[in-house]
Amino acid sequence: MKKFLSFKPAEDFLRSLKKSSQWFLLIIIVEVTITLSFEGYVFHHFRLITVEKIDVFINAMVPSTFALFCMACPYLLYTAVDALLNKDVIQMSALLIFHVSLFCLSVVQYFQIFSKDPRAIFLSALYLIDPIRLVTSFNYHERIVVNSHMLLFYLKPFVIALPVLIGVTCILLSFLVYKMNKAFGWIMYQQHGPDLRMRRRYLVYKIFMSLIKSDYYFCLTATVQYAIFFSTISRVGLALTILVFPCTIATLMTCRYAVYRENRALLGIVQFMFMCGLAYFIYNCARLYLGVDYGDIAVANICMLVFSIVTIIYLFTTIVVGFYCISNFGYGLREYLRYIHQKQKVNAAPAVPKVRMPLDD
């Protein structure tokens, strides 16, 4: 029980970090905590706004952005810890690019939430409400709309603070990554050796692995957004969207195995699945943009459209780098990866304590 409750591995990990790495992890933890708090506060108060058909607008908009940021926070924390554990500057740089995309999405979220006045939404939805119920409960609905307008006013500082927080965090992390790149330079040289060609192949491999980790977040989060969105449109679309989950996870796991084992046939199948996924996201992106069968909800969900475009860019980049990885097969990268993995195990192993042998009299 004491071993189970022991925090010694975490303590050893924190002690092994330098000051710049500790600040890097601390900033990520603070950012994740504040982001979850702000998004949870906004989401909770938005759920209070329910006015007949107006709640369709709210239900289609707010949960999708809430799911986006809620899934981003564990991804940020995991990627930061993994990058510091492996002293992977490439993954840290990928984390900075991820922050830029998250900053753009937080700005889009602000314009999405405050683009329409609740009164205008209410008046545009009058024809959808039963006339008898409208006459008998108009004052009730009007009072809720006024309260909703005041609620949006009180929530505005929290929604504005989110892109400011992400932007400042990105600037601070950029400075720390620059310092850590200098500190880890000699360590990386000791691990990889002076062979420039092999180092370039290894660099492409690490970039591809970072893209795969990003694809986990973007593809699965986009699928969650589509599932929330399609739940208000059709059950068939919801069922098909849920089926994308296991296919995405299986494809990305197979991709990691195929690259590490240098299996051309398996990675070729994975590349084909990536192209199918790219076509799937382009199709949904086009439907969101054109507003087919969605009506006003498509106009409201700009954030989902922007997120789909970012997912398409990441997936397309993964496909391009994947073909580059296939061209590097057969040049000793597989053995090189095994050598680095064994070397990291040896370096991570605890030192054998020196035991004094007593002298015989």
Swiss-Prot record:
Protein's recorded name: UPF0658 Golgi apparatus membrane protein C1952.10c
Coiled coil, from the record: none
Gene Ontology cellular component terms for the protein in this record: Golgi apparatus; Golgi membrane; plasma membrane
Cell compartment(s), UniProt: Golgi apparatus membrane
Keyword Membrane appears in the UniProt entry: yes
Origin species: Schizosaccharomyces pombe (strain 972 / ATCC 24843) (Fission yeast)
Lineage: Eukaryota, Fungi, Dikarya, Ascomycota, Taphrinomycotina
Keywords: Golgi apparatus, Membrane, Transmembrane, Transmembrane helix
Domain of life: Eukaryota
Transmembrane segments: 23-43, 56-76, 94-114, 120-140, 158-178, 207-229, 233-255, 265-285, 302-322
